[in-house]
Design a protein with these regions (language model features):
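Intrinsically disordered, low-complexity linker/loop segments enriched in Gly/Pro
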Residues: 142, 147-189, 194
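His/acidic/aromatic-lined binding-pocket segments of jelly-roll/cupin-type domains
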Residues: 109, 118, 135, 141-144, ...
Length: 352
């Protein structure tokens, strides 16, 4: 299975785009993982699976910065998603979004399965990306934890303030001190964590997350040697001192960490899956009918069924959904009514 695998069941109706089932879109990466994604998606593990397919790029208009440049979603008619959005931004994204952003969805959604601990890395802010990477998007991101092994840990932010020389020394050393400098956070299924651009972070082994991100693959790999990454890849093609200027030197306090966390699993009916601070970059909403169907407004969204079975009704008809399904929903589908014993997470761009 490759990053060119297409979305299944997508056809363009005469009136515009319709709801699409998305097949796995799993490019090869430099770190291990992927088995939890295939299990969650109820998809057969491909014969050529090499243990390094840890990310499923959902409704993606972004490409890998390195490692072959794949990642873009291709629709069933062979159209790449960026081209489809550009051809009908109002139908896909809605008039208000199209007026502000054109055909840019302002969103990258992924499933990520950490078959090993990820390297300590960070992502640049919008301002840094505009100044040095010729891009309007940085990479604030959020993790919605779907499954986690007992004792699973993530790390976000430096525990103490590091001077410029101290950070450079840790990056030079490429040893355990870099991870030890970060704040460990225990996570379990149902947690959510917002990771602002610039904050160094890592995901420990044994975690399956649904990620929302700004639509780039910009990463400054503070740890890179043990993962076999070339320096040009590790530092985004920039000089190392410049790349390290994108990193927040800390400290990230316990109070600040608490403000970046929430429990999406506690939502019943309809409610936010992420801290409000993230809404400038993207939105995630839990939809869980409890005793009665729930109707949600029209919106472009990547919809992930994370538990149970149910149905989605819209002006375009009725669609059965079950855990592991991923849908690409255009604004043109109109309001959706969700029923049944199902939990959905709607991943959406920022409000226009």
């Amino acid at each position: 299975m490759t990053s060119t695998d297409i979305a299944s069941d997508t056809e363009l109706a005469a009136g515009g785009p319709v709801i699409a089932h998305l097949a796995p879109n799993i490019p090869r990466r430099f770190y291990r993982g992927g088995e939890r994604i295939f299990a969650f998606r109820s998809a057969a593990t491909p014969g050529d699976f090499d243990g390094r397919r840890p990310e499923d790029w959902l409704g993606s208009t972004a490409r890998l910065f390195a490692e072959g440049g794949g990642g873009v979603t291709t629709l069933a008619d062979g159209t790449e998603l960026p081209d489809a959005l550009a051809a009908d931004p109002v139908g896909w994204l809605g008039a208000a979004h199209a007026a502000r952003f054109g055909g840019d969805p302002n969103l990258l959604t992924k499933l990520l399965d950490s078959g090993e601990r990820l390297p300590v890395h960070s992502h640049p802010s919008r301002d840094f990306a505009k100044a040095h990477l010729d891009c309007d998007h940085g990479k604030t991101e959020a993790w919605i934890v779907l499954a986690a092994e007992p004792g699973a840990t993530v790390w976000v932010g430096f525990r103490d303030e590091l001077g410029e020389d101290e950070l450079a020394e840790l990056v030079d050393a490429q040893d355990e001190r870099l991870l030890e400098a970060c704040n460990p956070i225990s996570v379990s299924a149902g947690d959510a964590v917002l990771v602002p651009a610039g904050q160094p972070h890592a995901i420990g082994e044994g975690v399956l997350v649904l990620e929302l991100q700004e639509p780039t693959d910009f990463s400054v790999m503070l740890e890179h040697e043990r993962f076999g990454l070339e320096l040009d890849h590790a530092f985004l093609g920039l000089d190392r001192p410049l790349a390290l200027r994108s990193v927040d030197h800390g400290p990230l306090s316990a109070e600040r960490i608490a403000s970046l966390r929430t429990r999406w699993a506690d939502v019943e009916g309809q409610g936010p899956a992420l801290p409000d601070e993230g809404s400038e970059y993207f939105r995630a909403e839990v939809v869980r009918p409890v005793g009665a169907p729930v109707t949600v407004d029209a919106a472009y969204a990547v919809v992930v069924a994370v538990a149970g079975r149910g149905a989605i009704d819209s002006a375009q008809g009725s669609l059965a959904v079950a855990a592991g399904d991923v849908l690409l929903v255009p604004h043109a589908a109109g309001p959706l009514t969700v029923s049944g014993d199902v939990t959905l997470i709607r991943c959406m761009p920022p409000a226009p």
